[in-house]
């Protein structure tokens, strides 16, 4: 695909009709990692697990050539950065194994063995089970998690009824078996990053990913995906504050600022209330738009 998009004749035709930019969607490696095998993307490559170009689309060299070809016709290539979550790649698997500070990369919590009875059984061959409403309430009451979020995106009875899932027992690098509960705003194969961990590992990962797209691949603009879901906070009663949170605003400003400093621009699609969209647009992404897409939601 990338090779075809970098064709000079194609760009001559695009230039003739006034095309100044091409947004090709996420092309970096996505999906998961189980055992010694990669697993497919569960959400159209919006579950990134690395900065390498997925061979299904081509090579890094072909992406770079696409940018150069676009520039030759006074146009730019736009890429994506996904600040709120990853796929279940090596980083998540290291977090499950309690390796160094990797658990801090994700919004995940270890459940004490005496409370494993609150967790659902994980089917053989699966790597997680979605929590039911009563389990979320029980874990919230014990102080493990912040509780139900304001809404359940991708809600599907029997598949995703809450935004929390539990792992089976996982053997850690220290020889201890643990079960974790982790947050996922979207599908359970898209664990949410923790933007409030003292390690600031999530910020380092996402900023590094953005700069890789700009400085290595040659993208001149980045779409910020689901950047309105970076902060979540328990309110003591009722549902947790998970949309329009100040941390999302600050995180958006940080990421957009780094992108501008690197000489590029950013744009965002926000599936939020109008007031939250206005707040997120202050000092953050340079452009905003709304475009409904199947299974992902828009405005």
What is the role of each PLM region?
Residues 196-199, 203, 210:
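Internal alpha/beta core interface subdomains
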Residues 1-199, 230-288, 293-295:
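Acidic/aromatic-lined carbohydrate-recognition and catalytic surfaces
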Residues 82-85, 210-233:
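Active-site groove signature of glycoside hydrolases
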Residues 58, 206-208:
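Outer-membrane beta-barrel transmembrane strands
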Residues 299:
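Active-site-proximal substrate-binding groove within the catalytic cores of carbohydrate-active enzymes
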């Amino acid at each position: 695909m990338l090779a075809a998009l970098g064709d000079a004749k194609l760009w001559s035709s695009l230039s003739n009709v006034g095309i100044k930019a091409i947004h090709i969607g996420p092309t970096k490696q996505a999906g998961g990692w189980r055992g010694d095998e990669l697993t497919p993307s569960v959400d159209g490559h919006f579950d990134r697990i690395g900065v390498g170009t997925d061979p299904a689309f081509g090579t890094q060299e072909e992406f770079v050539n696409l940018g150069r070809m676009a520039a030759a016709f006074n146009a730019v290539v736009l890429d994506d950065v996904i600040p709120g979550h990853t796929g279940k790649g090596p980083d998540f698997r290291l977090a499950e194994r309690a390796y160094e500070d990797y658990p801090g990369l994700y919004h995940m919590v270890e459940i004490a063995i005496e409370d494993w009875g609150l967790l659902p059984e994980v089917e053989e061959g699966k790597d997680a089970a979605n929590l039911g409403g009563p389990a979320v309430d029980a874990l919230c009451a014990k102080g493990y998690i912040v509780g139900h979020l304001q809404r359940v995106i991708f809600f599907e009875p029997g598949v995703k009824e809450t935004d929390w899932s539990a792992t089976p027992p996982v053997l850690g690098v220290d020889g201890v078996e643990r079960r974790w509960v982790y947050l996922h705003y979207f599908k359970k194969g898209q664990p949410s990053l923790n933007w409030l961990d003292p390690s600031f590992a999530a910020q380092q990962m996402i900023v590094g990913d953005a700069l890789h797209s700009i400085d290595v691949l040659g993208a001149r603009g980045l779409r910020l995906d689901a950047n309105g879901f970076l902060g979540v906070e328990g309110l003591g009663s009722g549902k947790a504050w998970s949309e329009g949170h100040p941390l999302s605003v600050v995180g958006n400003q940080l990421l957009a600022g780094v992108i501008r400093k690197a000489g590029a621009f950013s744009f965002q699609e926000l599936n939020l209330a109008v007031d939250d969209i206005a707040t997120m647009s202050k000092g953050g992404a340079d452009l905003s738009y709304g475009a409904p897409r199947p299974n992902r939601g828009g405005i």
